C-alpha cells in the first residue's frame, strides 16, 4: 500500500490537485496525506472516492505502482505475442511446456493449468489436432463454474478456450456466462468480449444447423442488444440472421440480409470484413 500511496501522490500533484480537493470533504486531508507517505492505510471506499476526484483509475495506479509492469495475465499475453509465428508452432509448444515446469513447483497449480489452456488455444489455431487434456478440461470447467462473478479474465479465458468446446457444451458455458457477467457488463472490455462470444456461438450453431441453440443465442443477443455505436456487431448480426434464414429455407430473405450486411461494410470502408463475408456467402 505504501507504493500505491506514493503513486497516488505523484498523480495528484501532477494534476495540480490539492489534498483537500482530492478528499472532496468526505474525510480529512491529513488522513490522505498519511496514506500517501505510507504512514497509514485508507479504506477502499475512501480510496475509490479520492481516485475519482483526481480523475484516475485503479488500472493506472496499479500499472504505475508495479513500475510500469503489467499484471501476470498481461505478461502471459505478451509472451505469447512475442513467440507467435503462424508458420512455426514450436515456440508456443516450448512456452506450454515451461508453464508446466512452473506448475510443478507452484502452490497455485490451477493458475498454471489455466495459463497452459490459453497457450494451447493459440496452438489450436495453427493445428486443429491440438486438444485439451482431461485435467485441463476439468480445471477450466471447475474454475469457470465455481467463479460467481465473471469479469474480464473469465470472459477472455472462456473466449480463447471456445475452439475446444462442442456447440452444445459451448452453449452450456454461455448460459453460465450470462448469469454471472451481468454485474460488470457495462465495462467496455467486458461488453465487447460478451458480444463477441454470443455472436461466435450464434454463428457456430447456425453452421452446425443446431437451430435450438441458435435461437437461444439470438434471444440472448436481442436481450442485450447492441448500442448504436456498436456498428460492427450489428452488421455481423444482420449477416448471421441472413444465414439462419437461408439455412431454414427462407433463402430470398436470407440472401438479402447477407447482401445488405456486405454493402454496409463496404460503405463503412471495412473492406476486409466485406470481402470475408462476401466470399463466405458468394454474394
Identify what each model region corresponds to.
Residues 7, 46, 78, 112-123, ...:
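"A position-specific structural signal for the A-helix of alpha-solenoid helical repeats
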Residues 16-33:
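Short alpha-helical DNA-recognition segment
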Residues 66-77, 107-115, 149-157, 188-196, ...:
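Alpha-solenoid helical repeat architecture
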Residues 100-207:
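Mid-protein regulatory/catalytic core that forms ligand/cofactor-binding pockets
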